[in-house]
């Protein structure tokens, strides 16, 4: 079994029946799974991790998560959602081993929504900041090095496109 939500330490037993599994991501070496759950069906997503080599769910949790993807090794990148509007507005790099996190991108404009993805060759993480009328694209290398994860702008925002 990939995940038994009864084993997730941060889900209260009384909310198990109302908890939705939102999705999974698997690390390149298949040793770690990142999963997202909506605890109590509140439309607020929490991410957790399972070590597939030991079969144990880690106690680590990330709150107000939008997208989550693996970098290299045990590093993940995720979008964090605003507590009031649930709008994904920043990208955080998180090291599952150490618990260290760093915000690498933030868009404070309340009309912009941020999402992330990986290029097909798995070399870069793509950061999109979108509205219904415009967008801009940033990229960062998919690496464990903290210095190399600062994004650079690939496509500048153009209004009314």
Segments predicted by a language model, with ranges:
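Beta-propeller folds
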Residues: 1-161
């Amino acid at each position: 079994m990939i995940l038994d939500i009864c084993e997730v330490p941060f889900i209260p037993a009384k909310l198990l029946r109302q908890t939705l599994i939102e999705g999974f991501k698997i690390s390149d070496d298949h040793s770690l799974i990142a999963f997202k759950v909506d605890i109590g069906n509140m439309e607020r997503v929490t991410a957790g991790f399972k070590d597939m080599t030991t079969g144990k769910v880690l106690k680590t949790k990330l709150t107000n998560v939008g997208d989550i993807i693996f970098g290299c090794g045990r590093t993940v990148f995720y979008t964090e959602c605003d507590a009031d509007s649930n709008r994904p507005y920043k990208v955080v790099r998180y090291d599952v081993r150490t618990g260290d996190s760093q915000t690498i991108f933030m868009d404070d404009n309340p009309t912009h929504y941020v999402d992330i993805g990986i290029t097909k060759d798995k070399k870069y993480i793509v950061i999109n900041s979108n509205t219904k009328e415009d967008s801009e694209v940033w990229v960062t290398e998919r690496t464990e090095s903290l210095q190399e994860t600062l994004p650079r702008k690939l496509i500048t925002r153009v209004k009314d496109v």
